[in-house]
Amino acid sequence: MANHFTYTKGIVHKTVLHDAIVETATSSAISIAGVRGVGIQITATGITTRSTVLTITVSMDGGTTYQAYSRLVSNSANTNAQGLTRVASVTQGATGTTIFWLDPTTLAGLTHFKAVATITDSGTPAGTVTVTAVKTY
């Protein structure tokens, strides 16, 4: 499912990468050539004994070869002097939502990305995970 929103400063395109998954999954390749920004949201619902680690892989050759991306910008609270917090993965261990971004200074040259959701259960699995991306042109 994709949604397009037009704002005065550009077009925002929303894509569901993983929809209510219950086991480890890799999304299809998402084109990001020419984007100005990419935001990603991971939402866990009904989680009790499940943890999800979300990593991003990126391609610079049209989606043929993918590498782990270690410059996700975390939504953590920092002072101006500390700058942005960059991480290699985001963990969602409880019901809730976490947002983060691909570092905009690294988007030039990137053509595609994939979201890899690794789900670990400790006990009887419960709950689902949904991952959504928003691209700004």
Task: Give each language-model segment a name.
Residues 2-137:
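Surface-exposed, low-hydrophobicity beta-strand/loop segments enriched in small/polar/acidic residues
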